[in-house]
Amino acid sequence: MKAMILSAGRGLRLMPVTKNTPKPLVKVGKQTLLERNITLLYQSGITEIIVNGSWLGEQIESFISNIQLEGLKLHYLYEGSEPLGTAGAIYNAMDCNLLLNENFWLVNSDIITDFSLPNISLLNNRVGHLILVPNPEHNPNGDFGLRSDQVLNESVEMLTFSGISFLSCRMFDETTERSSSLVDIFRDKINHNLISGELFLGEWLDVGTVKRLNRAHNTFGKN
């Protein structure tokens, strides 16, 4: 099974921490965010991981070149000085034949979680499965609703997208703009009842700002 870690973001909300360090290589405790997510995927049985990069991408490339985990293949895709966006990154991986006609896990590089990847089958022509979490302080209105295992664009009770999803390459066809945001693509597919999901209640933190990075140090800094 393959996975991709989205790692090309500029990390402006983490300045000045990210002035000379790309966001995925920011450390929480003894480990970088990227290392934590590679370990998470590897321990869940992932055997091939694609990591994209842009800002200070040479540091990311050097970092993953030194990771040695038995049975794991790591690929680095440099996107140039301007990131391709969340959907563009996936199209780029498909163009490079690193993602073919298959299903794969997609993880944001700036989250910390103890989520364990389940075995998922995309049934009834669905093209994606989203992991949702209770709304954190910084996103009180949530992103999506959930009825049974069906993700909704609107609901009385909204939840937050965790940055973890299980996707089919069928989601990214010729009808979709490469410059689209991944969330916009999700919303379109949700309108056609093509996205399932589940609620995760374990440890999860989006390390997107200096304030939340400090919280991560307090919560996860010992490991």
Regions found by a protein language model. Name each.
Residues 105, 112, 118-122, 135-138, ...:
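Catalytic-core segments of class I nucleotidyltransferases/pyrophosphorylases
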Residues 36, 40, 59, 89-92, ...:
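Alpha-helical elements of Rossmann-like donor-binding domains used by nucleotide-donor carbohydrate transfer enzymes
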Residues 1-60:
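N-terminal glycine-rich phosphate-binding loop and ensuing alpha1 helix
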Residues 54, 77-79, 131, 154, ...:
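Conserved beta-strand termini and adjacent loop/short-helix elements that scaffold enzyme active sites
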Residues 66-142, 146-148:
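Conserved beta-loop-beta/alpha segment of the NTase-like Rossmann-fold superfamily
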Residues 29, 55, 81, 202, ...:
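Short beta->alpha linker loops
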Residues 2, 47-49, 73, 103, ...:
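Residues at the starts of beta-strands that form the adenosine-phosphate
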